[in-house]
């Protein structure tokens, strides 16, 4: 029972990470296409500025839960996917560096360099996460000892690449909707146009990915055995359709919420289709690491569940406060050189001041 609970929580942590850091990654990927001027690029940085590092808490949480609740799965996963996960790690490091270093020097060439780094450092995780999870859905060549018998190029199969493109498009759509919420004027118009342009591509990719899933994986076995699970792909489809409907009505926060629902539905569709498998072996089904043969002791799972019941709500409350505080669009006033973060503790239950989301990344004043 505890193994099942932790499997669902593990899935939820990944889903929350994809929802929250997904718009950051999508926003960074859109930077060279939508940021036409220096001011617009600064708008885009500040649309993600207060959120991106807090969002990565969920990635750390998902990795930590994998390590603590499913140590065998953690060992096999990080061994088999060592190369893509290492690239992912370096990409996230350089993304953080690009946020901090971009405006340290008053030079167009310097800023252009870090804009390029920022773009690549956001693009790479979008694709790598899709490739990694698609291969987990399909199964990877690991033996009973957990030894990986494959290569990095072996992960770049048709289904893996389809997963990479799928995740990229999913995050770009999510990021475009977020930018439309956080911007005004021409930048908002282009963000809405980007979301509208990407949406039909996303719908087509969803159909293609679901079809490929039937040929390359055994995810549908769980759904055929328990038809009630089909609510998950239907939830994803409803979220995607709802996003388009809300965009057309100009209800941007609802559109973003529907996009988040789409991401959650996609994540649960894939991972719950694997259950109880976590690392499916394509060499020998008996070598598959499951939530039951790869979990920690019952005592460990009980203690962790108690900690999670206390800490997860605290993190959610903190992030709710943060998102509420910085919920307004970024304005030109926010980009003032002397702008600063308002402490805002008293704003938790009140409407934030118009300038409470002051620029996180401004021009260097040196």
Residue ranges of each PLM-predicted region?
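Juxtamembrane membrane-water interface segments of multi-pass membrane proteins
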Residues: 27-50, 68-71, 100-112, 175-194, ...
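Short, membrane-exposed interhelical loops at transmembrane-helix boundaries
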Residues: 281-303
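Short, often N-terminal, low-complexity regions
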Residues: 345, 352-361, 365
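Membrane-interface helix-loop-helix modules in multi-pass inner-membrane proteins
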Residues: 51-124, 143, 219-227
């Amino acid at each position: 029972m505890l193994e099942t609970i932790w499997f669902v929580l593990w899935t939820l942590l990944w889903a929350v990470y994809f929802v929250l850091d997904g718009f950051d990654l999508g926003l960074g990927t859109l930077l060279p296409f939508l940021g036409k001027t220096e001011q617009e690029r600064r708008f885009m940085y500040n649309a993600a500025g207060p959120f991106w590092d807090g969002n990565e808490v969920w990635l750390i949480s998902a990795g930590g839960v994998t390590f603590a609740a499913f140590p065998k799965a953690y060992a096999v996963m990080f061994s088999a996917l060592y190369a893509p996960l290492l690239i992912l790690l370096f990409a996230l490091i350089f993304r953080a560096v690009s946020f901090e270093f971009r405006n340290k020097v008053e030079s167009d060439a310097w800023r252009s360099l870090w804009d390029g780094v920022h773009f690549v450092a956001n693009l790479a995780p979008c694709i790598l996460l899709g490739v990694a999870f698609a291969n987990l859905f399909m199964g990877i060549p690991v033996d009973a000892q957990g030894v990986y018998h494959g290569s990095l190029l072996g992960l770049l199969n048709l289904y893996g690449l389809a997963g990479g493109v799928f995740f990229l498009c999913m995050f770009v759509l999510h990021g475009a909707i977020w930018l439309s919420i956080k911007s005004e004027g021409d930048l908002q118009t282009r963000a809405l146009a980007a979301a509208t342009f990407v949406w039909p591509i996303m719908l087509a990719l969803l159909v293609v990915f679901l079809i490929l899933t039937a040929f390359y994986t055994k995810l549908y076995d769980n759904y055929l055995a328990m038809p009630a699970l089909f609510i998950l792909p239907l939830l994803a489809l409803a979220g995607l359709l709802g996003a388009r409907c809300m965009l057309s009505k100009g209800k941007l926060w609802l559109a973003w919420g529907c996009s988040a629902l789409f991401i959650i539905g996609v994540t649960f569709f894939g991972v719950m289709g694997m259950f109880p498998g976590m690392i499916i072996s394509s060499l020998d089904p008996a070598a598959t690491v499951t939530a039951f043969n790869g979990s920690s002791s019952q005592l460990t799972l009980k203690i962790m569940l108690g900690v999670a019941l206390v800490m997860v709500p605290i993190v959610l409350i903190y992030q709710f406060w943060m998102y509420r505080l910085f919920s307004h669009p970024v304005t030109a006033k926010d980009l003032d050189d002397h702008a600063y973060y308002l402490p805002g503790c008293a704003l938790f239950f009140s409407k934030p001041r118009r300038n409470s989301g002051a620029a996180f990344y401004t021009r260097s004043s040196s």
